[in-house]
């Protein structure tokens, strides 16, 4: 159905269409739809709150939000309490608290949703004092959401006792299952699972979200056993519960369990949705299960599951890691509205497959699409430079991080050090290790040591080993690999006595080489 046909079905139909895009995790599609409508000169005030929600969802699009604010003033609907409250919420979620407060102060009429939006804006941006002031000011007409905004805010500030104190102050009649779940979320999100467990057992009415929240909490701290135990306690399981189980397995590297749960879920009559397939595709990518990945892709097409950015990225990532560049490219080219995450997946895919030049071209294409690269983008494109041996391009891209306001982390430094090392620039790489603002990890130091071995530079290798020995964070497996590398280097440069002495030292430490494992299942 084209845009004209959608418009012919009326404002209510278009509103539902926008809502569906947002609820399915495709706010960009909602913004594209609204843009097409406005280009045709059509305007309906009821759409504004919905589009403002979409603006707050998309890496917040505050510029578009401000344009909507201007349109609201132009069409005389800015004084509408729903529009005003939505503007406050949008500005708050985008970090523009001053603009949110300006809208709040200028509103001729406010309801409890307006106050809640302003309180939530302050709390989400770390201003508990002003939020508390408004909270006390609205004491007569507080509703459940008012209390929840404050409790959530204190939870984000890791002020758990204050959050619990507010929960205890909350009137009994307002303590619905949502309020209980928010307080539980404070414990879970701060990894206080013992406190969460005690609170969870006291919840009088547990819905699917409450059960899944507990499962997610245990999965987050890597306690798969307890998460699974919670799952088996749920009598009436639904899709939310199954999705939590599958996602938790995938996130903890239990790929086979995730795949088994995926098929068991369908066996019990539950149809996968976008969340399900995103998680199971991640499991397929981890375990190299191209056969299952292809089956999931077929299921997506057969059942009409929306290819939102999460599903698209998961498909690209799965095909890339399972060695199917052709299908990864096909999925990418089928995406009508490309996001930063989508381009990141494709750049990583090209880098994995040794297509460094194409990865750099994709990075350049992002600029033409007005997509701002993030830290993941730079890791992907620097990895492509390493694989392709593009030293000058890598140095230029690393410098560009500053202009894009992206602070390099240890992974970015690791890529650059690897690139310098491969190019024989060992002194420059060593200088970077000494000067970088983050502590070098095993991978970074191992990359430099490996480069020393390739270029037969024992003097530099010994300098690197001094850093490794004093780093204080080297695991046995990494120590063995580093020591083995320098021992081999001594042997290659015919320093036999030194090599033998190092081998003896390794034996004294009881270091053994850790075997590696790689798998890929094809059909």
Curated annotation (Swiss-Prot):
Molecular-function GO terms, alphabetical: RNA binding
GO biological process: RNA modification
InterPro entries: E_motif, Pentatricopeptide_rpt, PPR_At4g14850-like_plant, TPR-like_helical_dom_sf
Signal peptide feature range: none
UniProt-annotated stretches for the region Type E motif: 444-523
Database matches in Pfam families: E_motif, PPR, PPR_1, PPR_2
PPR repeats by residue range: 10-43, 44-79, 80-114, 115-141, 143-173, 176-210, 211-237, 238-272, 273-307, 308-338, 339-373, 374-408, 409-439
UniProt family annotation: Belongs to the PPR family. PCMP-E subfamily.
Protein name, entry field: Pentatricopeptide repeat-containing protein At3g21470
UniProt organism field: Arabidopsis thaliana (Mouse-ear cress)
Protein encoded by which gene: PCMP-E29
